[in-house]
Amino acid sequence: MRHYEIVLLIHPDQSEQVPAMLERYKGMITAGGGKVHREEDWGRRQLAYMINKLAKAHYLCLNIEADQAVMAELEHAFKFNDAVLRHLTVQKKKADTAPSSMMKTVEREEARKASQTEQA
């Protein structure tokens, strides 16, 4: 089995369905004999450029271990899900379980917002 990192950009109006979508994709991975090593919800973030006249998207990152049949099934599911604006799959040499630099940035922003609300 190979290790992959998947980043999904979800339509911002579908943010409520993100947990259900994530569970469905994780179910597909585990049903095919794969493992989810890391899942990160980066939240709604500004896009670098407009996609389908949208300036923001909900970001998800998954680090998984799966075979090629499961990956083909996932790619097929991403393509035919209208809520998925873009997806990127990168093959990795080993499983990443530590928080990504993007997740550290998200946590830092949340801590800053929390301290601002406490001061107010």
UniProtKB/Swiss-Prot annotation:
- GO MF annotations for this entry? small ribosomal subunit rRNA binding; structural constituent of ribosome
Q: Which CDD domains match?
A: bS6
Q: Which Pfam family, any one, appears in the UniProt record?
A: Ribosomal_S6
Record bears the keyword Transcription: no
GO cellular component terms, alphabetically, are: cytosolic small ribosomal subunit
According to the UniProt entry, which residue ranges have a biased composition of type Basic and acidic residues? Answer: 105-120
Cytoplasm: is it a keyword of this entry? Answer: no
State the Gene Ontology BP annotations: translation
Protein role: Binds together with bS18 to 16S ribosomal RNA.
Q: Which family does it belong to?
A: Belongs to the bacterial ribosomal protein bS6 family.
> What is the protein name given in its UniProt record?
Small ribosomal subunit protein bS6
UniProt lineage: Bacteria, Pseudomonadati, Pseudomonadota, Betaproteobacteria, Burkholderiales
